[in-house]
Amino acid sequence: MPLLDSFTVDHTRMEAPAVRVAKTMNTPHGDAITVFDLRFCVPNKEVMPERGIHTLEHLFAGFMRNHLNGNGVEIIDISPMGCRTGFYMSLIGTPDEQRVADVWKAAMEDVLKVQDQNQIPELNVYQCGTYQMHSLQEAQDIARSILERDVRINSNEELALPKEKLQELHI
């Protein structure tokens, strides 16, 4: 099985919260696609609570689109990582990491402004697979933590696992 890009970086050295360009590619028509690793938690040390990450999933995508879309950028998708330490954001365009970090912080400010669970988009049995598994309080705790800790940039070069280590891990 081919090695996924996300498994070629050393998770023991990742900082969080931090932005990292996880992958860049071009469509057959030449459009640039960038995938960002938006790391909310330090891998293997922290994890977002399931209700909080689920609520954040509903809020974060819209807020990020409000702040980032335009000027050659359009978000395709923002999805939580299975390990619950962050989100992947796929988009058309090539915004730099600092722009993404600034927008991420603005989106966290927006999360803190949500006053009631009823303001969470698509929070119903028809549009959400587990519509009762939400917590606005947990989502706001996550947002507050991001803003208090600030958002850094993780460098692929600094995090790259050496080929010897990948071989040692039998990958």
From Swiss-Prot:
It is an enzyme of class 4 (lyase). Keywords: Autoinducer synthesis, Iron, Lyase, Metal-binding, Quorum sensing. Binds 1 Fe cation per subunit. Involved in the synthesis of autoinducer 2 (AI-2) which is secreted by bacteria and is used to communicate both the cell density and the metabolic potential of the environment. The regulation of gene expression in response to changes in cell density is called quorum sensing. Catalyzes the transformation of S-ribosylhomocysteine (RHC) to homocysteine (HC) and 4,5-dihydroxy-2,3-pentadione (DPD). Its EC number is 4.4.1.21. SUPFAM superfamilies: LuxS/MPP-like metallohydrolase. The keyword Metal-binding applies. Pfam families: LuxS (PF02664). GO terms for biological process: quorum sensing. It comes from Escherichia coli O157:H7. This is S-ribosylhomocysteine lyase. Belongs to the LuxS family. InterPro entries: LuxS_sf, Metalloenz_LuxS/M16, S-ribosylhomocysteinase.
